[in-house]
Amino acid sequence: MRLLWGLIWASSFFTLSLQKPRLLLFSPSVVHLGVPLSVGVQLQDVPRGQVVKGSVFLRNPSRNNVPCSPKVDFTLSSERDFALLSLQVPLKDAKSCGLHQLLRGPEVQLVAHSPWLKDSLSRTTNIQGINLLFSSRRGHLFLQTDQPIYNPGQRVRYRVFALDQKMRPSTDTITVMVENSHGLRVRKKEVYMPSSIFQDDFVIPDISEPGTWKISARFSDGLESNSSTQFEVKKYVLPNFEVKITPGKPYILTVPGHLDEMQLDIQARYIYGKPVQGVAYVRFGLLDEDGKKTFFRGLESQTKLVNGQSHISLSKAEFQDALEKLNMGITDLQGLRLYVAAAIIESPGGEMEEAELTSWYFVSSPFSLDLSKTKRHLVPGAPFLLQALVREMSGSPASGIPVKVSATVSSPGSVPEVQDIQQNTDGSGQVSIPIIIPQTISELQLSVSAGSPHPAIARLTVAAPPSGGPGFLSIERPDSRPPRVGDTLNLNLRAVGSGATFSHYYYMILSRGQIVFMNREPKRTLTSVSVFVDHHLAPSFYFVAFYYHGDHPVANSLRVDVQAGACEGKLELSVDGAKQYRNGESVKLHLETDSLALVALGALDTALYAAGSKSHKPLNMGKVFEAMNSYDLGCGPGGGDSALQVFQAAGLAFSDGDQWTLSRKRLSCPKEKTTRKKRNVNFQKAINEKLGQYASPTAKRCCQDGVTRLPMMRSCEQRAARVQQPDCREPFLSCCQFAESLRKKSRDKGQAGLQRALEILQEEDLIDEDDIPVRSFFPENWLWRVETVDRFQILTLWLPDSLTTWEIHGLSLSKTKGLCVATPVQLRVFREFHLHLRLPMSVRRFEQLELRPVLYNYLDKNLTVSVHVSPVEGLCLAGGGGLAQQVLVPAGSARPVAFSVVPTAATAVSLKVVARGSFEFPVGDAVSKVLQIEKEGAIHREELVYELNPLDHRGRTLEIPGNSDPNMIPDGDFNSYVRVTASDPLDTLGSEGALSPGGVASLLRLPRGCGEQTMIYLAPTLAASRYLDKTEQWSTLPPETKDHAVDLIQKGYMRIQQFRKADGSYAAWLSRGSSTWLTAFVLKVLSLAQEQVGGSPEKLQETSNWLLSQQQADGSFQDLSPVIHRSMQGGLVGNDETVALTAFVTIALHHGLAVFQDEGAEPLKQRVEASISKASSFLGEKASAGLLGAHAAAITAYALTLTKAPADLRGVAHNNLMAMAQETGDNLYWGSVTGSQSNAVSPTPAPRNPSDPMPQAPALWIETTAYALLHLLLHEGKAEMADQAAAWLTRQGSFQGGFRSTQDTVIALDALSAYWIASHTTEERGLNVTLSSTGRNGFKSHALQLNNRQIRGLEEELQFSLGSKINVKVGGNSKGTLKVLRTYNVLDMKNTTCQDLQIEVTVKGHVEYTMEANEDYEDYEYDELPAKDDPDAPLQPVTPLQLFEGRRNRRRREAPKVVEEQESRVHYTVCIWRNGKVGLSGMAIADVTLLSGFHALRADLEKLTSLSDRYVSHFETEGPHVLLYFDSVPTSRECVGFEAVQEVPVGLVQPASATLYDYYNPERRCSVFYGAPSKSRLLATLCSAEVCQCAEGKCPRQRRALERGLQDEDGYRMKFACYYPRVEYGFQVKVLREDSRAAFRLFETKITQVLHFTKDVKAAANQMRNFLVRASCRLRLEPGKEYLIMGLDGATYDLEGHPQYLLDSNSWIEEMPSERLCRSTRQRAACAQLNDFLQEYGTQGCQV
């Protein structure tokens, strides 16, 4: 052996003497665009005195003659034999050398150029190079949002911070993009960042589905410099308290015989930190690797919270029993998790919050063992360092844990040697164990175990490097602990095994992808190197050392992690010393930095963390260091079997002319291949077995849908008949029937009670109400601002009114110190005594509302407080308001207190509840919230449009009649609103029309939930922008209008992307098949919007490509999932629909050609052009046949003209269209034609008088005429026929903008904008209009002077009494438009609207099957409550447990109060059907206004839309409205159901309205009223005597026949009639019948004698008159009896045109005595007095 080593030493010495000079070239293996590249050059083995000069630069490997960077010179010598250079990589040079055009991969070549290479080394060239990976990634971008979670429709505010590679502010241009939860880009913005901080915001579309959205940013010239942040979108309400589940141990051991009792603690605390009083409902289950839950039956528990906490124990026996029911044992649980769900119901207010624990693992050891920091390479003859990290299952480091190592060393020809070592972990859970390694080693096998008696075990095998090499380099680290910034790290270098005689070690330090330091150290017996660790080396670095032995480099490396806890600079946030604050107080926020910096602040309610997912965390320094470390090019802990491997693993590229590292292929490190064994646990439970019978995911989902219950009664056969896919129907039906057989028929319901303080006492020694601040401002976040701070600044902040914990975040950006994220500061805002108040969304006049504020007392003493509701006009309150209730609130508890309130005015009132303590205990709180009060009945709208033409003498005077709808509620005080304009283009497309704050969408009064409807946000705005651009009229509108237009277009683009599918197509709903028609519509509009939305042309090219796949052989297009059924469009059914669709797609494809700008898309563009030509031939053929209806003829003519089809085809289409034109006056339009099968409209209106209102046409006529106008403009320009068609279209616009529905509005505005561009003139014209009317308040007159270029005073909105006629006089030389809008509430609707459609809504009290309907199929498996005869059944079965899992998706706090839960829930049934002879456009919408105080259960609505047997296409909830979308209305009655919960008690609930209408023809509708269940407490009286008396103050008082005492007052009837209130009518009537009308009772009577009249000139004996009284009044007139009624004239009329009378406090109602009664001696005088009054008043009236 000695001889062998001697020979090796001799040969090495001989080799050393032959070492040749060489140039070494080092660089990071990746070049980042625009970032300086560190390059190391070194001379090796050159003769003494040698000087070498040269330069380094980058070049394109394929284009050697053009450099990609400037050249950097170097000079090396034998004394100064190395240099570290910096090479700039400018963007302009990278482009000029063609790097961006490389096809084979993004590589760039680093080149060293020196004549010495050729002259002294006899090389063939003076170039030495190495290939590097080229990346456009550079710098750092950090993003921040103002909240982690948002509701759909909420505004997102965000910031982007830009830094360069050295973490200093960057001012480059960035591109920001927003992606929705489907991964589709919905927003793109390019911005310049002069301050390095960019702030912006956007609104999430209200139709967005729940999911995770992403905002990403990149430097605009660096496509790979992408950074992003995520946030959650879902419907939520901020929780009032948070629930946490904490297991006793973070793991559950599954070792046989060692299963312990499972302990867990449940904690519930209000967001402001105080404990919750209430009850906890807990259930358990299993979670598998895929997250699927299986619930344990029988382990449910109910416990009371004590001081906000509850302790739960699950015994070994209970758990094993539950496992046995699943046919499982303890050993089957390895790798699974125990799932725990807890629902807490707060006692005082009945609010519910939930939490779940999903990280409680079943494990074989309580520890985990991590060997990732141990090298995978060893140095023979040098110690091998084993580095292990031991963690507890919670993830925290495990200190003091024994780690045992068994190291087996294998050497050739000898017996393996085993070393056993034991060492305890340090405070950070780590151990570093050196293992002695002999020089002859071939393999090292390590077996490591941590902990006892159930250790975590890991194994590692390390092979020795190949023998026969040039020796080895060992890097030894005396102190293995991670250094901190500012420490000095000592490393020892040793050459092992070669006997090499070199003079120096060379070493480099690499951090964040750059060589930051290069040096050499003379060789000694033990060479020590000291490394000072500064901020540039954080959070980790590689130390790489090497030497040369002969012609071979010998190298090793070591990765060093740095404890980089703080940022380079400094940012500290602090507040004044108080631990607790009160709302409305000022707080001084201290900002401290160590340099001039911009500090970005934000404060958010920590309740948001409880509302959302825990995964969306705010930006912190950990994320910053993670981003910095992402530039680290090294992979692994260091080392390698060869020098080239060492360099590559450290992220270095190397070349010495003879050998070099291979070019890197990707930025990231290769991932270790890990395999996970899928567990196949057989639960053998009924439902799981059933699911297991189906292999395909589709069949499984259908089966799962089948076992899920609906919130309404349906047999499985009925449900299966609705499933559209045949292959889904069988598993759905089978699983539905199977689940039905498993369900139990009854469940127990538990109730709990609350106490109320009802005693009303007078105010005594109370503190002044003015001293109590009113709380009314409750934001979710605030303080979103950026401050400039020079080392120190104090901000004075005023705290909002929320009682919560605020978290203030700060982030600083300094030119000298870079980015720093401060530790957040928490501010707890709290009042020891406070109240909490909930209000319903809205109530109606004279309904009775029970307010139930909850008083919280966290003081250590009992409090007696006085609580009252402040007086406010429009509300009836006890004592007129201000009368207080005195309530005792014990220390540390809460008490609810009830107030009855009756609203009497239809308005929004600010309702303030005040609680006051005494001077002895001066506590108090006041909360103000707005209560929305609406009128009775349902809103009805009607519009009139008049053309103003002073040039036609017949139209210079108009008379607009007043409205006298017999259904109008009697005391609504309604008005007619008049709007006059002299500029139709600016009126329709300006800042009050298409560019109004909500766009046309907000003006249509239609829902916008489906894919087609949402385009109303985008298309009209584009038409308006196009008109204003072309006519240069932006300046006539408010300055911000154009910015607003761009914002509207961006919002529309974001909305429509919610409906895009991966193949580029669009669907009305994502769950439906793609629609050809909708996809074409989107393509057309987005092609026109490309510039504004910054959308991807490639995405629209995909859309065009999908449309081509829908074209048939004859050139037509098919639509397998139509959005609208257009069979009603006129002409031949079916044929017309195909023709219209083909024309529509052809138009879209033509507009879509604009996105084919790049050369690569040319083949697809040619295919599109060929498709258009083929479709045009089809259309021409159909037009030539002459059988098309008006709509198909119009769109065909336009398509052929737009695409420049052959002239003969265009001519035929034009002639066909003009043959169908219809005239009315000077207007031209296209509607129904003779022989049309359309049932949509009435016959053509006859020519009219100019002073008559313009007949309002249906949506289809408007759309047809718009297409005709578009055709005429292309065919003949602005000519007479185009003028006439445009004039007709203009007069069809609604009062507030838009037309009837979405499609007609989009096409009409498109056509009118094109016409107005063509007809624009700068000539000024004037219009003079005088309006006059005599109304309730006398004569009223307005004179208007308008011109056609005005914007100020462009639209004058005037109000006139609804029943009064309006006289109009017109003058001037300009045409204009006058529109009248009448809005009023009606008593009844069905008689006038329900011709073709029918809707019926019924509400019932809670029924048994609806309870079960809220459960998943999992509940049926394992969670059925024990039956009554079960001996183990709990004494009080728990209702919330039955609701638990089924409501996981409902909005928070949807749980009703525990008190009287059954009574506060109702079941809605909505039934729709239609007349079988009537055709519909397809989509219909049921708009159900819920009864006051109710909201629908979202989980129920989701079941109607999300299962395979879909009943409703989509649903929306807006305030008290539930909108249900139906694809069609059946001819037979079809019903759907859902539950609703009343959060706030309301009594005397009035009927609410429901409307069913055809979306695309809204005039076709049915509106009805429905009421609360009969004998329901919803109809009971809630008010106290005094409040009831106030509410009835406006009610009439019935005078009983010959009331006692009144006869003593002479002439009391005459005084009422003639003095106060002085009546306007007096009748003696006989009551015939009573009828209910909305919130009123109607009495139909026959006049028997007329005593007096004012307005009712036709009143006579035997005529009929109607009298109305509010349903909330107690007055009842008995049919068959006669009454004397006197009062004031009414404002409404019956169907015959006769006045109707409202009976109120100004009415006299007296029952007429019978003849028998008058004959009695006692009443004779009184009867005579009554007859004398009737005689005198009837003949002489009032003598005053």
Swiss-Prot record:
One of its GO terms (biological process) is innate immune response. It is found in: Secreted; Synapse; Cell projection, Axon; Cell projection, Dendrite. InterPro entries: A-macroglobulin_rcpt-bd, A-macroglobulin_rcpt-bd_sf, A2M/Complement_sys, A2M_N_BRD, Alpha-macroglob_thiol-ester_cl, Alpha-macroglobulin_TED, Anaphylatoxin/fibulin, Anaphylatoxin_comp_syst. Prior to secretion, the single-chain precursor is enzymatically cleaved by plasminogen (PLG) to yield non-identical chains alpha, beta and gamma. During activation of the complement systems, the alpha chain is cleaved into C4a and C4b by different proteases depending on the complement pathway: C4b stays linked to the beta and gamma chains, while C4a is released in the plasma. The alpha chain is cleaved by C1S to generate C4a and C4b following activation by the classical complement system. Residues 676-679, 1447-1453 form a propeptide. Pfam families: A2M, A2M_BRD, A2M_recep, ANATO, C4_MG1, CO4A-B_CUB_C, MG2, MG3. The modification Sulfotyrosine is found at Y1417, Y1420, Y1422. Coiled coil: none annotated. Disulfide bonds join C68-C97, C635-C669, C702-C728, C703-C735, C716-C736, C1471-C1535, C1583-C1588, C1595-C1673, C1618-C1742, C1718-C1727. In absence of complement activation, circulates in blood as a disulfide-linked trimer of an alpha, beta and gamma chain. PANTHER family: COMPLEMENT C4-A-RELATED, MACROGLOBULIN / COMPLEMENT. This is Complement C4-B. It comes from Homo sapiens. The gene is C4B.
